[in-house]
C-alpha cells in the first residue's frame, strides 16, 4: 500500500538555487526508507515538501492517494500524519521545559488537557526521558535533545516519521539508541523515512533506498540492488558500504560462496567457505591414509558449528613433518541468545536466569532496560550493537541474555531467528520469561520430548 507519493516534484529557492527536479517516488506503508546523497543533493528540501512546510512549484504530493492541500486546516492534518525531526534539534526545541516542548504539537492540534498529558507521558516514557520532563532542553546532551524532538513528533501519533540526518553529531552509543527507537516505531507500524550520507547505515538498516545527486533522483531499489552499482555510487559521490566491500573482496579471492549481499558482520562471516583441507603437524610414524583425532576447533576454524570435534584423514606428508589432511567435522555444544522482557521485570528472576543458565554475556537495549539494569547492579557487557554482538558470542558457544522491552523484544527475537534460519547454524533463541520459556539445545538433545525454541 502506497502511503506517500510524489509526481514530477520541482522546487527552486527564491535566490535561484534549484533544489529538486522532477522527483517521482512511492513510499510503501510500514517500510524503512533511506534517502542517500551528499550534502546539497536535495534531501532536506524534499523532506520539507513531504511535511507541507514548503509548497512545490511544480508537481504534486499525495498522502493515501489524495493530493496535498495547503489551507491551514489541511496542513494541520498533514503535519499530524507526517511528522518531521530536523537535523539540528535546536531548530525544533524552544519551550522552557522538556514537557512543554513535547506538548506543543498536541496542544496545537486542539487535544484536551487530559489527552495532551497522556500523549506526552507516553512519548517521554517511550524515549526514556520521563525523569527529565521538567528540565530546560538547552541543558540536555545532543542525544537527549534528539530524543526530545522525536518525542514531540511521536506525541502527535503520526503514520510517517521523517528524520533529516538523525545521527548527526551523536556519539556511537547515542546513535545506537536513536536507531533502536526508530526500529521500535517501525515494529509498531510507523513508516520511517531518513536522509543520510552514511552508506553503511542506509545499507544495513533500510528496506528501500533512494539515491539523490544534484537535485535529482538517480537510482532506487533495495539496498542490495542500489549499492552494488559502482558507477551509480560514483556519480552520487558515494562509496560502497564497508560490509559489502569486504564481501566482494573475499569473494574475488575465492573465500566466499554463494551470491550474497551480507548486511551485518554475522551475515558476512557466514559467507566464508568452510575449510576442507588443512596443514597440521603429525606425530612421527603416521602414514598417509591414516586417521587422526585433531581435537576441538572453534572461532575462525569452526565453519559449521560454534565448536567442532575434528577427525582427519592424512592425504600427504611433507618432509618437514607437516601433513595435508582432509577434515571431518562434528558440531558440539552451541551457545544461544535468550531475551528477557523487561516489561515483566523481576531482579531476583533475572539473577536466577543468569545463574541457572550459566549466562556469560549480558546486553541491554532501550533506555528503560539499561536504566533498570544499572540501578540494580546488573553487569552489562554490551549496550550498543547488542543483537549482532550477542549472535557472534553465541556462535562461539557463549550463552547470552538480552534485556529489552516493548516491541524491541520481538524485533530482537525475529532478527536472531532470521540469522539462524539463513545461516543454518543452530543455537538456542527464545524469550525466557514468556509462557513456555525455552531450553538450551543440548538439553533438548538429551530429552527429545522437550519443547525446542
Swiss-Prot record:
Q: Which processes are annotated in GO (biological process)?
A: cobalt ion transport
The principal location of this protein is membrane
Highest taxon, organism lineage: Archaea
- The keyword Transferase belongs to this UniProt entry's keyword annotation: no
Q: What keyword terms does UniProt attach to this protein?
A: ATP-binding, Cell membrane, Membrane, Nucleotide-binding, Translocase, Transport
The family database entries (PROSITE patterns) matched by this protein are listed as: ABC_TRANSPORTER_1 (PS00211), ABC_TRANSPORTER_2 (PS50893)
**Ligand binding (ATP):** 37-44
Q: EC number(s) for this protein?
A: 7.-.-.-
Q: How does it sit in the membrane?
A: Peripheral membrane protein
Entry GO CC: ATP-binding cassette (ABC) transporter complex
For this chain, the annotated S-S bridges are none
GO molecular function per UniProt: ATP binding; ATP hydrolysis activity; ATPase-coupled transmembrane transporter activity
User: What task does this protein carry out?
Assistant: Probably part of an ABC transporter complex. Responsible for energy coupling to the transport system.
Which NCBIfam families does this chain map to?
Answer: cbiO
Question: What family is reported?
Answer: Belongs to the ABC transporter superfamily.
Q: What is this protein called?
A: Putative ABC transporter ATP-binding protein MA_3551
Phylogenetic placement of the source organism: Archaea, Methanobacteriati, Methanobacteriota, Stenosarchaea group, Methanomicrobia
Amino acid at each position: 500500500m502506497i502511503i506517500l507519493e510524489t509526481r514530477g516534484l520541482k522546487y527552486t529557492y527564491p535566490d535561484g538555487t534549484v533544489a529538486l527536479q522532477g522527483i517521482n517516488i512511492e513510499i510503501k506503508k510500514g517500510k524503512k526508507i533511506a534517502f542517500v546523497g551528499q550534502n546539497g543533493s536535495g534531501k532536506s528540501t524534499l523532506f520539507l515538501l513531504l511535511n507541507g512546510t514548503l509548497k512545490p512549484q511544480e508537481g504534486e504530493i499525495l498522502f493515501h492517494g489524495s493530493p496535498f492541500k495547503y489551507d491551514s486546516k489541511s496542513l494541520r492534518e498533514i503535519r499530524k500524519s507526517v511528522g518531521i525531526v530536523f537535523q539540528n534539534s535546536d531548530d525544533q526545541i524552544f519551550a522552557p521545559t522538556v514537557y512543554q516542548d513535547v506538548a506543543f504539537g498536541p496542544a496545537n492540534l486542539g487535544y484536551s488537557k487530559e489527552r495532551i498529558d497522556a500523549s506526552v507521558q507516553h512519548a517521554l516514557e517511550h524515549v526514556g526521558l520521563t525523569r527529565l520532563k521538567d528540565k530546560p532542553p538547552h541543558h540536555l546532551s545532543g542525544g537527549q535533545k534528539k530524543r526530545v524532538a522525536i518525542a514531540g513528533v511521536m506525541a502527535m501519533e503520526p503514520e510517517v516519521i521523517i528524520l533529516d540526518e538523525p545521527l548527526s553529531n551523536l556519539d556511537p552509543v547515542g546513535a545506537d539508541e536513536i536507531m533502536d527507537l526508530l526500529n521500535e516505531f517501525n515494529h509498531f507500524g510507523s513508516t520511517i523515512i531518513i536522509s543520510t550520507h552514511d552508506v553503511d547505515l542506509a545499507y544495513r538498516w533500510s528496506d528501500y533506498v533512494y539515491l539523490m545527486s544534484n537535485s535529482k533522483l538517480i537510482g532506487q531499489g533495495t539496498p542490495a540492488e542500489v549499492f552494488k552499482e559502482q558507477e551509480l555510487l560514483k556519480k552520487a559521490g558515494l562509496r560502497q558500504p564497508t560490509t559489502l566491500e569486504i564481501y566482494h573482496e573475499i569473494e574475488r579471492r575465492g573465500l566466499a560462496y554463494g551470491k550474497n549481499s551480507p548486511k551485518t558482520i554475522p551475515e558476512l562471516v557466514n559467507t566464508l567457505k568452510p575449510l576442507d583441507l588443512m596443514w597440521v603437524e603429525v606425530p612421527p610414524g603416521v602414514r598417509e591414509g591414516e586417521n587422526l583425532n585433531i581435537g576441538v576447533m572453534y572461532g575462525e576454524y569452526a565453519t559449521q558449528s560454534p565448536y567442532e570435534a575434528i577427525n582427519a584423514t592424512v592425504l600427504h606428508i611433507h618432509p618437514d613433518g607437516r601433513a595435508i589432511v582432509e577434515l571431518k567435522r562434528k558440531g558440539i555444544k552451541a551457545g544461544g541468545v535468550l531475551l528477557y522482557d523487561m516489561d515483566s521485570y523481576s531482579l531476583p528472576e533475572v539473577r536466577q536466569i543468569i545463574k541457572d543458565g550459566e549466562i556469560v554475556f549480558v546486553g541491554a537495549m532501550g533506555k528503560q532496560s539499561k536504566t533498570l539494569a544499572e540501578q540494580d547492579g546488573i553487569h552489562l557487557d554490551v549496550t550498543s550493537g547488542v543483537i549482532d554482538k550477542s549472535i557472534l558470542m553465541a556462535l562461539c558457544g557463549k550463552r547470552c541474555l538480552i534485556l529489552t522491552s516493548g516491541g524491541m523484544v520481538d524485533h530482537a527475537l525475529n532478527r536472531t531467528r532470521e540469522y539462524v534460519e539463513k545461516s543454518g547454524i543452530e543455537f538456542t533463541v527464545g524469550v525466557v520469561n514468556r509462557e513456555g520459556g525455552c531450553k538450551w539445545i543440548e538439553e533438548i538433545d538429551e530429552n527429545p520430548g522437550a519443547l525446542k525454541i
